Design a protein with these regions (language model features):
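C-terminal helix-rich "cap/oligomerization" subdomain common to oxidoreductases
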Residues: 63, 73-75, 305-350
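Active-site loop of classical SDR/Rossmann-like NAD(P)-dependent oxidoreductases
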Residues: 36-40, 245, 289-301, 315, ...
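Contiguous beta-strand/loop segments that form the cofactor/metal-binding neighborhood of enzyme cores
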Residues: 189-269, 297-313, 343-350
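Beta-loop-alpha module in the N-terminal Rossmann-like domain of NAD(P)-dependent dehydrogenases
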Residues: 39, 53-116
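Hydrophobic residues in well-ordered beta-strands that form the structural core
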Residues: 99, 105, 125-127, 156, ...
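N-terminal Rossmann-like dinucleotide-binding module
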Residues: 1-51, 191
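Predominantly a Rossmann-like dinucleotide-binding segment in NAD(P)-dependent oxidoreductases
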Residues: 123, 131-217, 337
């Protein structure tokens, strides 16, 4: 029997998750969607695809939880500020949860979700760190784990987005926790994965406003660099940008004692190269979805399989707590101009 799942949130991510579940996850059945945005509700109610698949449309999350008696799981893809409360309500209802990153920008709130999940071991509750499901990043992990580069000690990772001309990023900035929390969170997660969960020791950062001066009202920037020193001598360097001219550009380089692994050194939309009097050139994906569409499908399939086959979820929920601690420390360092330090147990001391 397929897993009955509801998608919460119908913004740019929610719509894509519904489509993925409908056409790329054969063991899942989308039974409902929920959004509080009137325009999204109208769009869903008049969408022939949703009618064809008999997807119920709700504008109230609590009402959906009460009405959908056969519901088994939810995929939370709303704005960050309600991730935790919606996950908690689902857990209390006895539902499995796949929650987009981050669980919350408030560490205590995020920890409450982890605690609730632990109190219900029969439920699968997973954090959505999608890059862990990308074939290239997984191949890099396998090479590192097999000892191909010796002991990894340095990660350099970028998340650079195409310059946003629509105003979406500026509007979203008030709720996303800042550029390091929103933009570098995947890079931080990859660092913990590739370097075997090192404990942070110190964070410092700097940034600038190049295209979106309005971000200053939220204490944020559109370009930033952060460095994390870990206990034991490991280091990570992150570059985040919202102003790239060429497209979505994500690069990760892991250096070890006997070599290095690089992922996506030269971003490209596909394998087409145009050769003319101007030389050789290729196009780049405009945004993250074109780069990670397959990863999101893999993530969904593995979550559904974990539920239906009673397997361990591929990404532990606790991972999100450590990632958020580092992301917030970098954001604090960015705003204060001071180094943020951690003790030997990974707890902040300033």
């Amino acid at each position: 029997m397929p897993l009955n799942i509801a998608v919460i949130g119908l913004g740019r991510m929610g719509k894509r998750h519904v489509h993925t579940l409908l056409y790329r996850v054969p063991r899942a059945k989308v039974v409902a969607i929920c959004t509080t945005e009137p325009s999204e509700i109208e769009w869903a109610q008049t969408n022939p695809e949703y009618t064809e698949f008999n997807i119920a449309v709700y504008d109230d999350y609590d009402k959906m939880l009460a009405s959908q008696t056969n519901l088994q799981a939810v995929w939370v893809s709303t704005s960050t500020d309600v991730h935790a409360i919606q996950s908690l309500k689902a857990i209390e209802k006895g539902l499995h949860v796949l929650c987009e990153k981050p669980i919350s920008t408030d560490l205590d709130e995020a920890q409450s979700v982890v605690t609730a999940a632990k109190s219900h071991p029969e439920l699968k509750v997973m954090a959505g760190f999608s890059r862990r499901f990308d074939a290239s990043y997984r191949d890099a992990a396998e090479k590192i784990q097999s000892g191909s580069i010796g002991t990894p000690f340095l990660v350099r990772s970028n998340t650079c987005d195409l310059k946003d001309e629509t105003g979406f990023f500026v509007r979203y900035a008030a709720r996303n926790g800042g550029i390091f929390v929103d933009c570098a969170i995947h890079d931080i997660d990859l660092t913990l994965w590739y370097m075997d969960s090192p404990i942070p020791k110190a964070c410092w950062a700097a940034g600038s406003l190049q295209a979106h001066p309005e971000l200053a009202e939220n204490g944020d920037v559109d370009n930033a660099v952060g460095i994390v020193e870990f206990w034991g001598g490991k280091i990570a360097y992150f570059y985040c940008s919202r102003t790239q001219a060429h497209g979505h550009d994500v690069l990760t380089e892991i250096t070890g004692t006997e070599g290095k692994v690089l992922v996506n050194v030269i971003p490209r939309a596909n394998n087409v190269v145009l050769a003319d009097k101007g030389g050789l050139r290729h196009e780049v994906q405009p945004e993250y979805w074109q780069r990670f569409e397959h990863a999101f499908a893999t993530e969904a399939n593995e979550f559904v399989d974990a539920v239906l086959s009673d397997k361990k979820v591929p990404v532990e929920l606790e991972t999100g707590i450590t990632v958020m601690k580092i992301g917030q420390a970098l954001q604090t360092a960015l705003l204060s101009g001071e180094v943020v330090r951690f003790d030997g147990k990974g707890e902040r001391v300033n």
